[in-house]
A protein has these predicted regions:
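General beta-strand structural signal in soluble alpha/beta enzymes
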Residues: 128-130, 202, 235-237, 270-274, ...
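Proline-rich intrinsically disordered, low-complexity coils
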Residues: 63, 76, 86-89, 101, ...
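Glycine-rich ThDP/TPP pyrophosphate-binding loop and its adjacent helix/strand module
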Residues: 1-34, 38, 247-353
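Thiamine diphosphate
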Residues: 134-262, 277-281, 318-327, 336-353
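Generic secondary-structure signature for well-ordered alpha-helical cores
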Residues: 39, 43-46, 56, 60, ...
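Conserved acidic/glycine
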Residues: 1-171, 181, 336-338, 343-345
Length: 353
């Protein structure tokens, strides 16, 4: 204030004194300061011209387009092919009798999503990070080339700025916070009309899912209450259940994955594909909806892919409906009830009987 006062020869009432003890006095003091500043503007046309010209110049200096910005008016999130279940290519799936974990099915579809987006729109659709589990949870698939061997590796702000895979550590809360923030950044010309930006995907052990809950719940509230359009989050609860394997003594959480259900109705979809071939159809169907959060529960070990046709089971693509028949009623027996099964080891055990 002193520099301003000396330069424009104006006094600030009670300048240098302690602030008033009551709110009314503080408001009065603030008003007097503003009056002093405005008095200079009223009596100094040169200052007004300078401020106006400077503001106009700054506004006109903002480019209408930034050449090196990867996000353009072409919007991959509106590309129905990426999430179209009937058109999913055969090489996303493995043949009956082969052994594969469902997390590998996730990796394949992740690479399919971003490869299609990069090839058609010049940028990935999904930015991913993991709690030091990028490869074991297979979220690293978002940085791999679909149908090829190219691996973009981990993002580096100097050496590798094009990779969609962030090098995060065991910082679950921070990871979900960063991606919740990222998925609210809308580059669309009218952010109230549609979302054009990046989706986020993050992973950790299912037993540590609760560490991600807070920021994701806040993201859910924005999606629910704000008129601004937001993106989507893929919340991977990896290595879930008794299949946690060698880490089971410290990393096996029975109840923790239940935190993925603590959202308002219609604001999260929980996916539990029990085998490799169900992942892509289930995730594609979920991403085709307007639901902003998808929790994908995956397991660690490989299991044998069933021969669905021989067993009379529905196609793996029926996983896109959320539930399907493994075995229908025996028409020669009375109807004795329904068995509902979910999860890798439980469903695998039932199918093998």
């Amino acid at each position: 204030k002193k520099d301003f006062s000396d330069k424009y020869n104006v006094d600030f009432h009670k300048f240098g004194e302690k602030e008033a003890s009551l709110k009314e006095g503080q408001v009065e003091q603030a008003i007097s300061y503003f009056d002093s500043v405005f008095s200079v503007m009223k009596s100094n046309q040169g200052l007004v011209d300078y401020l106006a010209d400077t503001l106009i110049s700054l506004g006109e200096s903002v480019p209408s387009n930034i050449d090196d910005c990867k996000i353009t008016v072409k919007n991959p999130s509106k590309d129905k092919k990426i999430f179209d279940v009937p058109s999913l290519p055969d090489d996303l799936f493995v043949s009956p009798g082969e052994k594969a974990p469902n997390r590998v099915g996730f990796s394949k579809y992740a690479s399919y999503i971003n490869t299609l987006s990069i090839n058609k729109y010049g940028r990935p659709l999904v930015i991913a990070m993991s709690a030091d589990l990028a490869d074991s949870t297979n979220i690293s698939g978002f940085a791999k080339e679909y149908g090829g061997s190219k691996d973009m590796g981990l993002y580096d702000k100097i050496k590798n700025i094009n990779s969609p895979l962030m090098p995060q550590g065991i910082t679950e809360f921070a990871n979900s916070g960063m991606l919740a923030g990222l998925a609210t950044v809308n580059f669309n010309e009218d952010p109230y009309e549609e979302f054009n930006g990046y989706y986020g995907a993050m992973s950790t052990y299912g037993s540590f899912s609760y560490l991600k809950y807070g920021p994701i719940r806040l993201f859910s509230q924005i999606a629910q209450d704000s008129d601004l359009k937001v993106g989507k989050l893929i919340w991977v609860a990896g290595h879930s259940g008794p299949e946690t394997a060698e880490d089971s003594r410290t990393h096996f959480g029975i109840f923790a994955p239940g935190v993925t259900q603590l959202f308002p109705d219609g604001h999260i979809i929980n996916l539990h594909p029990w085998e490799h071939n169900e992942v892509a159809p289930a995730l594609a169907a979920a991403m085709s909806t307007n639901v902003p959060i998808v929790a994908l529960h995956l397991t660690r070990p490989p299991i044998t892919i069933p021969d669905r046709k021989a067993l009379g089971m529905a196609s793996h693509k029926e996983a896109s409906k959320g539930a399907y028949l493994i075995k229908d009623y025996n028409k020669n027996r009375p109807l004795e009830g329904v068995v509902i099964v979910r999860g890798t080891s439980s469903t695998n055990s039932l199918v093998s009987i």
